């Protein structure tokens, strides 16, 4: 009951929207108090708390159990540790598959030839998604065991590969490479799949160093299309390679605060290199805000699809049992267009180019092609 009361009070006092999106928050308190007093197991209690936060309807605020927070904390520290094949995947329920967003270097998945953009259809003959379209855990299992993975590369027929399970540890990978435009320009490409890992900004810096080792770049692509956001310090640390100073303002029920990126972290011209940022429906939270800031300041040309509009700043509130709630506390107003409401409009690209992640490889991706053409014509 103590955690419930703490959680309800936190939302009551700190939630961004004073009308609770039309929800009678006092009635919610009474409903859940009665359910808890009637008797709930630990699992049912945590499910109820998650449901209570979900009822706010902002599609952003969330509740995490102590076990979930342990995983989140490990990810932030760059200390993921589990047994599996070494991929980061996301469900694509409309095509009954999961698409690979990242492959851990040296992992069994990499050794088996799996790449980002590949889809996983089945594992040992069982669907990778459950009946509701959510990811299953069948890729995980005892260390040293082997699984049959039915995969499909965009544009190719499905095939099956044998992949062993081993202990996977370390940071979320940040893939990068130098691409060449049809006109011969050197363009850097960095896939930023999250700001949840505290090493991401350093990895972006290392990628910039590596890509400019043989000379300056003519352009830079930041691919935020699968970036669901994460922690503010990682978002700021990444953005500072390309921009500095005041970038906008956070606004909540009590006050307005300035987002100051601080001093620039230029790496071999990263503050001035022409930029393209790619966005889409899976660009969320600080993924959206970072893309919008680069567009708003004139620092980058944006290519892709309009984002869904989910730019609330979540604050983390920790409770006595180790659980945590991430509650929408602020919304964002860009520096040069403070009248803009990205929560309603999303980030609207300068050039609309649909490109579903699981339907194209990097080589065939129409958004990447459009970006390379942009640099040639600039």
Predicted regions and their residues:
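Extended, small/polar residue-biased N-terminal targeting/export presequences
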Residues: 19-97, 146, 155-175
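Solvent-exposed, polar/charged alpha-helical surfaces in well-ordered, non-transmembrane soluble domains
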Residues: 2-9, 26-30, 34, 43-54, ...
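C-terminal recognition in membrane/secretory proteostasis and scaffolding
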Residues: 2-13, 17-30, 34-47, 77, ...
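Sec-exported extracytoplasmic/periplasmic mature domains
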Residues: 8-20, 33-41, 50-61, 105, ...
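Conserved PDZ fold ligand-binding element
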Residues: 109-131, 221, 302, 339
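Extracytoplasmic
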Residues: 40, 47, 80-86, 93-98, ...
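C-terminal regions of proteins
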Residues: 257, 265, 318-319, 327-333, ...
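Cleft-lining beta-strand/loop regions that shape enzyme active-site pockets
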Residues: 110, 133-320, 374
């Amino acid at each position: 009951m103590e955690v419930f009361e703490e959680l309800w009070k936190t939302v009551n006092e700190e939630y961004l929207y004073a009308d609770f999106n039309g929800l009678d928050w006092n009635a919610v308190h009474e409903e859940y108090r009665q359910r808890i007093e009637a008797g709930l197991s630990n699992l049912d209690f945590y499910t109820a708390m998650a449901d209570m936060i979900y009822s706010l309807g902002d599609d952003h605020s969330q509740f995490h159990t102590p076990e979930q927070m342990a995983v989140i904390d490990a990810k932030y520290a760059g200390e993921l540790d589990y047994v599996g094949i070494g991929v980061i995947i996301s469900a694509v329920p409309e095509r009954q598959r999961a698409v690979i967003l990242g492959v851990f270097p040296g992992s069994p998945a990499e050794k088996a030839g799996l790449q980002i953009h590949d889809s996983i259809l089945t594992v040992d003959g069982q669907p990778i998604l459950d009946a509701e379209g959510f990811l299953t855990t069948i890729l995980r299992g005892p260390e040293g065991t082997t699984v049959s993975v039915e995969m499909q590369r965009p544009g190719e027929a499905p095939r099956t590969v044998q992949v062993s399970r081993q202990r996977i540890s370390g940071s979320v990978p940040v893939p990068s490479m130098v691409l060449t435009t049809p006109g011969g320009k050197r363009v850097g490409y960095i896939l930023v799949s999250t700001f949840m890992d505290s090493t991401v900004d350093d990895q972006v810096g290392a990628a910039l160093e590596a890509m400019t080792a043989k000379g300056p770049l003519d352009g830079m692509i930041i691919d935020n299309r699968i970036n669901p956001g994460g922690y503010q310090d990682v978002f700021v640390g990444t953005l500072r390679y390309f921009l500095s100073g005041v970038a906008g303002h956070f606004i909540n029920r009590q006050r307005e605060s300035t987002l100051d990126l601080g001093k620039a972290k230029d790496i071999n011209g990263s503050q001035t290199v022409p930029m393209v940022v790619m966005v889409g429906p899976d660009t969320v939270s600080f993924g959206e805000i970072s893309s919008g800031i680069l567009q708003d300041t004139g620092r980058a040309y944006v290519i892709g699809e309009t984002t869904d509009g989910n730019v609330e700043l979540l604050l983390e509130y920790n409770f006595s049992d180790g659980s945590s709630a991430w509650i929408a506390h602020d919304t964002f107003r860009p520096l040069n267009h403070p009248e803009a409401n990205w929560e309603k409009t999303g980030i609207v690209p300068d050039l609309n180019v649909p490109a579903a992640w699981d339907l194209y490889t990097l080589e065939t991706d129409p958004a990447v092609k459009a970006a390379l053409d942009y640099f040639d014509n600039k």
